[in-house]
């Protein structure tokens, strides 16, 4: 009976090998992706969009606006400045996100898990002092959980000011943007205790629509100024960084790094969605981001001498590069994308505090599980502290 069983197993293994061999090189490559930690599944790939890329997906809302504010307005955004900042943005996304996280960090996992504390668990045996950078990394993530809701949601709500139907209303009520932002933030934190499992399932599809929208509007503006792709040459970025045209000096890198906000989620959420699904979705995300940033750059080069825009305070190329009718869609999508990005970080903050508690780095706090999935946590004290801090920001 043992020999018969071994023979049957050998036949099954041979049949599998024959099946894989018959698929050809592409089929064999796809079979490898369907096994182990690199497995790709369409459903989890959609989930990865909502969990991993929400934060970095809202960066186009405010990165170029911050650049213009630092340079003194659109009048100072000449060809050298625009190509320079686009080059810095492109290569920052490439080096920090693609090279650092996708190609290097994601290979260093702790039994499939990623994140600062998972990395610490791998290296803690080399010295107790390594707890210090791990704590600093965790603290930086918690700070991001405060800043992201404030910046992303407020930048999205500011898009209402560019709509003709609401322009007069916001001009007469200067604090209206702040009040709407505060209301959305309060609603976001108030629903945490009830669990977000149901709406969380739709996050991936919404983020897919959002990135597709970014790519389309960026491409539409690129058709007016294709030469903006000269910024792919890193020489433009280095030259502008040390140029007299750069009013912000080296501090402009603070603006440039806004484009990589949330890149750490590719590593920290690797255990939730799978390494293969991140590998599979990242090329689409990067292309959409590059098209959107370069589309904004093309719009700036087309309008840098337009007196109507030069006099506009706090000009945001993201909304201005669209027609008024498209802006309505952009505002709705950007607000939803901002909420999704905030939700991912809030959930991540709960998980990180729980992990820090297990390491005895924080006092033991009350933890609730409002959803059927035990991995989804809710810590009332953390929720309240982040909410108040976000409102102050």
Report the location of each language-model feature:
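The structured alpha-helical core of multi-pass membrane proteins
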Residues: 1-393
């Amino acid at each position: 009976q043992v020999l018969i069983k071994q023979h049957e197993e050998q036949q099954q293994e041979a049949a599998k090998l024959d099946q894989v061999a018959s698929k050809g090189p592409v089929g064999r490559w796809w079979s490898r992706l369907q096994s182990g930690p690199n497995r790709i599944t369409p459903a989890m790939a959609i989930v990865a969009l909502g969990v991993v890329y929400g934060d970095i997906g809202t960066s186009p809302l405010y990165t170029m606006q911050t650049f213009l504010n630092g340079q003194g307005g659109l009048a100072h955004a000449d060809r050298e400045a625009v190509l320079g900042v686009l080059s810095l943005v492109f290569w920052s996304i490439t080096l920090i996100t693609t090279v650092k996280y996708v190609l290097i960090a994601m290979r260093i996992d702790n039994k499939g898990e990623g994140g600062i504390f998972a990395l610490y668990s791998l290296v803690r045996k080399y010295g107790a002092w390594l707890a210090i950078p791990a704590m600093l990394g965790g603290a930086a993530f918690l700070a991001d959980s405060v800043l992201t809701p404030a910046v992303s949601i407020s930048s999205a709500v500011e898009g209402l000011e560019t709509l003709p139907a609401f322009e007069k209303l916001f001009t007469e009520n200067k604090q209206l943007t702040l009040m709407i932002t505060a209301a959305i933030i309060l609603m976001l934190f108030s629903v945490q205790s009830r669990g977000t499992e149901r709406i969380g399932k739709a996050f991936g599809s919404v983020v897919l629509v959002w990135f597709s929208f970014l790519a389309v509007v960026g491409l539409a503006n690129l058709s007016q100024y294709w030469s903006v792709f000269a910024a792919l040459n890193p020489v433009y970025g280095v030259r502008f960084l040390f140029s007299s045209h750069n009013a912000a000096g080296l501090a402009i890198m603070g603006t440039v790094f806004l484009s990589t906000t949330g890149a750490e989620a590719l590593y920290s959420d690797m255990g939730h969605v799978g390494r293969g699904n991140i590998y599979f979705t990242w090329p689409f995300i990067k292309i959409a981001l590059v098209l959107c940033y370069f589309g904004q750059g093309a719009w700036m080069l087309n309008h840098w001498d337009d007196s109507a825009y030069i006099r506009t305070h706090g000009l945001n190329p993201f909304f201005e590069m669209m027609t008024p009718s498209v802006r309505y869609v952009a505002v709705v999508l950007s607000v939803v994308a901002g909420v999704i990005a905030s939700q991912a970080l809030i959930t991540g903050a709960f998980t990180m505090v729980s992990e820090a508690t297990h390491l005895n780095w924080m006092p033991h706090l009350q933890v609730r599980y409002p959803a059927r999935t035990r991995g989804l946590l809710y810590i009332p004290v953390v929720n309240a502290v982040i909410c108040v801090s976000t409102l102050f920001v």
